């Protein structure tokens, strides 16, 4: 698989099922930041959007071999480089 790094930083909300991104920065604070770090969502981590609920929120992401659902409001605080 060939990946081309985008130069624009967006939020994790911007990727759709089948798209990849690399985590750039996590803006969340407190317990939410700790939860995201605990599930392996750290800067530099590759993430794939693998699905979304019928309503569009939450989306499911493949993170370090585990599928994790993240709400849109939390995705907005995760900045990424899309591939």
Regions picked out by a protein language model, each given a short descriptive name:
Residues 1-83:
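Compact, glycine-rich, soluble single-domain proteins
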